[in-house]
Each structure stands twice: as C-alpha cells, then as structure tokens.
Amino acid sequence: EDHVFRVDHYLGKEAVQNLLALRFGNAMFEPLWNARHIEQVQITVAETVGVEGRGDYYDHSGAMRDMLQNHLLQLLCLTAMEPPSQFDPSAVRNEKIKVLRSLRAIEGADAASHSVAGQYTSGAIDGRAVPGYREELGRDSGTETFVARRAHVDNWRWSGVPFYLRTGKRLPRRCTEIYLQFREVPHSIFPGAVPQPN
C-alpha cells in the first residue's frame, strides 16, 4: 500500500497547482482570504460535451460522483485550507483533511435547500444540434448530469461564507473557475453609486 499513489488528475492542471502559490506566496491576497472580506465562493466546472461514449460508466456515477465528490472538493480544499507548515504532500493533505472535517453535513430536509440536480436534454451548442443524455445513452435514466450544491466550511476562517459548487455536461460554455466575491465596502464615498462587488 505504501507504494501505491492515488492522484486526482485535476491536481495536475497548471492553474490548480498555481492556486497554492497565489494564496500563500502573495502578501496581497492572503490577508483578505477569509470571511471578513469574502462574501461567497463559487467553484464551477462546466463542460460542453455530453457523455461521449462513456454512458455506461457515467450512468452509474452521475455528476455527483464523477465530478463533485472528488474534483470540486479538491478545489474547495485548496481554496479554503489553512497554510500548510511546509510545502510537501503530507502537510498539504493534512490541511485538506481539516477542511473536509469542517464541512457542514447536509442531512434530511436540508438536502433540498442546499442542492439541485438536473439532466441535459437535446438542444444546440454553437449552432450544432446535440442529443440529450437519454438519447446518447439509448435508454431511460434518472442519472444527474448537472449538480449544484451550497456548502459551508464551519471554521474560524470561513464561518458564514457559502461555497457554491456546480458542475455539469452540455452547458453553454466550457470553463473551470474559482470565483471569490468580496464584500462591499462599509461606506461608499460615491453618492448614488452602488459599486459592484469585486
């Protein structure tokens, strides 16, 4: 077991690898990276493709298992974690575990108010007709191809800040982004103007 390495391939993306440097190597961002200054965090992984021949696999996993429970949670951990004691895999993993342990459980009746799921139907992307999920699969299915969830990290740094995680297939544009919305200033010096949050 000590010789087996399990790696989420999303962690190999350059932008994901640079997230730790942006956070912990940048004196401008780190002091602002908390609930006092950030109103909400949105993490989106949107794909324009359908299941593309992976229907049998995807129909057993869906967007929740295929994307949210691994890739999006990895991005949430990198966004919400505390600085590791040193830059090595063990220290980074320990900080990620602390974030996962701080996630508020979503149970029972709360599930409906904290998450939404859907399935793509036939339509058009970039003017090209595309089949719906069930047409691609060749059978009826209730498997979700889109999922969005509101999460909360209940710790000192992030108390009260919602994290919106969303992912899906056959969406209008392909993107992977982490969006932090900063809080409004306490008093605007520009009368009549309502500045947009950054």
Predicted regions and their residues:
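Secretory/organelle targeting and membrane-embedding segments
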Residues: 2-198
